[in-house]
Amino acid sequence: LLANKKVAEFIGKQKKTFVYRIHDEPNEDKLINLQTVISKFGYAINMKSKQDISKSLNKLLNDVNGKKEQNLVDTLTIRSMSKAKYSTENIGHYGLAFDYYSHFTSPIRRYPDVMAHRLLQYYIDGGKSVDADTYEEKCAHSSDMEGLAAQAERDSVKYMQVKYMQDHKDQEFLGVISGVTEWGIYVEIIENKCEGMVRIREIKDDYYTFDDKQYALVGQVSKNIIQLG
């Protein structure tokens, strides 16, 4: 982190074109939606300032660790955050609370790091600021490719999970309820992290309705409660 920070700061203060790793503030509407959900579990977000939001989110993730609602809160918190990307326009890195940040330390596996190395050497040798538009195009392409790589990774994991479960159709697994909605529940198998949905109509022992205050399904006759965890 220190190397990434200092290289970006060294060039940034010279006002020369550089490849930054930037991270914008969380989306306000998504934060409000997150606040609505977590309030049902007794949590809150202080949205008075950027610093307060950052501290609140970190505290929230620490507080839910190991709790039955952790999976839901973790997912919603991540979704409320902006995605980090590459750009020549430095706005800082919100998640790390850095005014200057770059990806510099892994040129063996990331092209933006290669660009950062080349620009650093070029400027140390006395070079003038390079064309910002040219490098902004490279940054946009790098961000797009990063997104595709992340999606490919998620898809490959899902594919292998489906392939595994096809060979274990009649086997019983221990799972936890990772999500509750008005149309059903999500169950994650503890052993292998595979997740699937059980629709309300497939739960035959009662007629269940969604209780948004408890974030649970409640049986109309038995009053049985199906909730996170």
Annotate each predicted stretch with a short phrase.
Residues 6, 24, 29, 39-229:
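Structured C-terminal cores of nucleic-acid metabolism proteins
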Residues 7-21:
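Glycine-rich phosphate/pyrophosphate-binding loops
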Residues 11, 36-38:
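Hydrophobic alpha-helix position signal
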Residues 31-33:
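Nucleic-acid-binding small beta-barrel platforms of the OB/S1 family
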